[in-house]
C-alpha cells in the first residue's frame, strides 16, 4: 500500500503541465521529465538495501582527535613563525581595555 503511494507520487511529480502561449484555447501539454529513481528500477522492482558501514563512536573519535591535534600543531607553528620574524608580537599592554 505504501509502495503504491510512492509510485503514484513519483509519477505525478515527473509530469509538467505547460501551456502554449500563442493559442487562445489554453491547451495544456504534459511533458514527461527525466526521473532519477531512488528506490525502484524501471521495471518497478525494488532496489536492494545499500550496504551500511558502521563507524560509531570509535570512528568519530578516530577522525576528530587527529584533526584537533593537527590543527593545534599548525597554529602553534604559525604563531612561533610570526613571533620569530617580528611580524606579530603580542604585548601585555594591549590586554588592558580600560
UniProtKB/Swiss-Prot annotation:
Alphabetical list of InterPro entries matching this protein: MCU_reg
Transmembrane segments: 52-72
Gene Ontology annotations of biological process type: calcium import into the mitochondrion; mitochondrial calcium ion homeostasis
Transmembrane listed as a keyword: yes
Topology of the protein relative to the lipid bilayer: Single-pass membrane protein
Pfam family, one: DDDD
Entry keyword set: Calcium, Calcium transport, Ion transport, Membrane, Mitochondrion, Mitochondrion inner membrane, Transit peptide, Transmembrane, Transmembrane helix, Transport
Gene Ontology cellular component list: uniplex complex
Location within or outside the cell: Mitochondrion inner membrane
Origin superkingdom: Eukaryota
PANTHER family per the UniProt record, alphabetical: ESSENTIAL MCU REGULATOR, MITOCHONDRIAL
Family: Belongs to the SMDT1/EMRE family.
Described purpose of this protein according to its UniProt entry: Essential regulatory subunit of the mitochondrial calcium uniporter (mcu) channel, a protein that mediates calcium uptake into mitochondria.
Protein known as: Essential MCU regulator, mitochondrial
UniProt organism field: Anopheles gambiae
Amino acid at each position: 500500500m505504501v509502495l503504491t503511494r510512492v509510485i503514484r507520487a513519483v509519477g505525478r511529480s515527473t509530469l509538467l503541465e505547460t501551456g502554449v502561449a500563442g493559442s487562445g484555447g489554453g491547451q495544456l501539454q504534459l511533458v514527461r521529465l527525466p526521473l532519477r529513481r531512488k528506490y525502484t528500477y524501471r521495471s518497478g522492482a525494488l532496489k536492494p538495501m545499500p550496504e551500511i558501514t558502521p563507524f560509531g563512536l570509535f570512528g568519530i573519535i578516530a577522525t576528530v582527535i587527529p584533526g584537533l591535534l593537527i590543527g593545534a600543531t599548525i597554529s602553534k607553528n604559525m604563531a612561533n613563525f610570526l613571533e620569530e620574524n617580528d611580524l606579530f608580537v603580542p604585548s601585555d599592554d594591549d590586554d588592558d581595555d580600560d
